[in-house]
Amino acid sequence: MSDIAITISLLALVAVIGLWIGHWKIRGVGLGIGGVLFGGIIVAHFTDQYGLKLDAHTLHFVQEFGLILFVYTIGIQVGPGFFSSLRKSGLKLNAFAILIIVLGSIAVVLVHKIADVPLDIALGIYSGAVTNTPALGAGQQILAELGVPQTTVTMGVSYAMAYPFGICGILLAMWLIRLFFNVKVDDEAARFNAESSQDKESLHNISLKVTNQNLDGLTLIQIPGFSDEEVVCSRLKRDDMEIVPKASTEIRTNDILQLVGDDNSLAKMRLIIGYEVDAPTVAYSGEIRSERVVVTNEKVLGKKIRALGIHQKYGVVISRLNRAGIELVPTGNTTLQFGDVLHMVGRSDVLNQAISVIGNAQQKLLQVQMLPVFIGIGLGVLVGSIPFYIPGFPVALKLGLAGGPLVVVLILARIGTIGKLYWFMPPSANLALREIGIVLFLAVVGLKSGGSFFDTLVNGSGLEWMGYGIFITFVPLIIAGTIARLYGKLNYLTICGLLAGSMTDPPALAFANEIKEDNGAAALSYATVYPLVMFLRIMSPQLLAVLLWAA
């Protein structure tokens, strides 16, 4: 067999062994995808003993391409929610997540400066301690740019030393915070549910009876609130007649209007129109029905709702729009993106015609448009290769193969659609590509570092590196968790999701969810901080490398 064939065969063997190890669980906690790294270490130990030669160029390509695939799919996943997570509702949680990252970075500086740990090893320990594999790839990239040799081996070994406690340390921090503050989980869940019902920003339906005499004879568009497009009127009931109103529909006293909007906007409409009634909020008449429709027609992508003329042509109202899990009040200026879910209301005989304009082709949601994938990867690699200079730094900075694709795809996923191209990927396809990418990357890291792993653990500084990893994992989590509880007054279940999200650690999220299975506090806070944290986890080792190299 050729060296390339042997190399690829061993990579497959590493993946099989590693994924098998990752499925081992102790009390519900396992290594997960990190098992591939240890699979690589085991295989590398025996390849060294038997003198098998691996092709270095193949390993290098597979490692870099795996990292690019992983980072790209992460960006596609979190891109639509990345910028919205920075809004006011998530500022406090993201601030605490940033605090954890900053404290972890300070811990790395202390380990490097006080304990005199080499920079490449310190960054490897950091990546393992925070269980973030893209951080490992980003650190290796920047150190290679700085001219540090053999970073794959040293960083891979130190990463492997710190990784196991990186997973366990998060769970231990959750348990200690619960113990220290004497938390009663049921009380925390009840408090979260009560606060959620008060603060929830999702859209609601109400029906208002027109009692304001000043509105009699006005068209819908002339009434404040409708003209500002703060709310949508999905139905109008007059006596026994029920219609989907247009902007030009005249309003009469005693008409009943069904409105859709957020709580604040609906409260304003109560003051303008009249009092709330129960009558038509649930049942639709035989002539009027509603449908949830997914935007899949490439001809409408990037167009404004007003330009489609759906309301004017068919008398159909788009009352809600769900984009990446976020509910919006659609206006005439709202631009449609692939995968948007619209709530459409109209007469049965014309609603299907309006739906055909939007698309609603479910099979398209299962297809992957490959052209945008390679455009995103290509642009990302180019952006990652562009040097930018900062005064006082010894070398030009680059985003690298980890940061470049991430930044580019975050922007593209946020834009969503350019012409007929759309940056949308079905969750199953995204997960498959992401898993393939990270398995390839970790398999190579394990193979490259496995030869020296056991020697470092038994005869070298392996146990010392584990200690530094525990310090980097544990101290930031405990400090931030305590401050969040003591001064931030955060719910304990929310803190658990925050801690898991700050480490981008799905096993920790699973553990947090099991604390109170019927409560969504942990998952919500995890999702809120995840996009920003993933970005900062990839950028932080690069900044640390340059700052400590220049110091």
Curated annotation (Swiss-Prot):
GO annotations of cellular component type: plasma membrane
Mode of membrane association: Multi-pass membrane protein
UniProt-listed Pfam families: Asp-Al_Ex, TrkA_C
Disulfide bonds: none
SUPFAM superfamilies noted in UniProt: TrkA C-terminal domain-like
GO biological process, one term: potassium ion transport
Keywords: Cell membrane, Membrane, Repeat, Transmembrane, Transmembrane helix, Transport
Occurrences of domain RCK C-terminal (ranges): 191-275, 277-360
Gene Ontology molecular functions: monoatomic cation transmembrane transporter activity
Keyword field contains Magnesium: no
Keyword set includes Lyase: no
Subcellular location(s) per record: Cell membrane
InterPro entries (alphabetical): AAE_transporter, RCK_C, RCK_C_sf, Transpt_YidE_put, YidE_YbjL
Residues annotated as transmembrane: 4-24, 28-48, 65-85, 95-115, 157-177, 370-390, 402-424, 438-458, 463-483, 492-512, 529-549
Family: Belongs to the AAE transporter (TC 2.A.81) family. YidE subfamily.
Name of protein: Putative transport protein CGSHiEE_03135
Organism (species): Haemophilus influenzae (strain PittEE)
Organism phylogeny: Bacteria, Pseudomonadati, Pseudomonadota, Gammaproteobacteria, Pasteurellales
